[in-house]
Amino acid sequence: MSAPAPDPFAKIRNATNAHRERHGCSAFPYANGPLLAALAGAANARRILELGTALGYTALSFAFGVRDATIDTIERDPDHVALARENIAAAGLDHRITVHEGEFSSVLPTLDPGYDVAFFDGGTPVPALHKALRGLLRTGGTLITANLNQGGTADSVRKALFDGKAWRSALVDEHGETAISVKL
């Protein structure tokens, strides 16, 4: 059995974790950037939307997964926005990744629909944001939802993702934290 491919952005993931510990903030990078890169590649994504930039780890992972995709990523913390922009520019990908500063609910209505992949990793999933993401995804587009094990509103989102009416969904980890859903 061969070893998994190295994570080209592990340094940024580790820096994000260190930043969170130092500052006590909510910068949590998704633990498996290579999985996100592979999913975006499998979906042949051209447009990707991310909610929850932190320091740019997952946006960079998506860009690595599909070499000609453009990524819109949203972050409300101005310090995280600045650090993400620095990391993205240092990787030479600032021409493909746009970091939008603001609340999800304020930025999402300004974006054009037709995304191939959307990724929610910005805290506890809430139904209103998932409804907005559904409106921005094309039919057949892929929604990746993290943090489904946080209870509260996440339970409502999980129920909607698995009702079989609007999405075809599967969990991607044994803890039930992340779902991959295709918009029907």
Region spans (language model):
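A short alpha-helical cap/connector motif
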Residues: 1-117, 124-144, 148-184
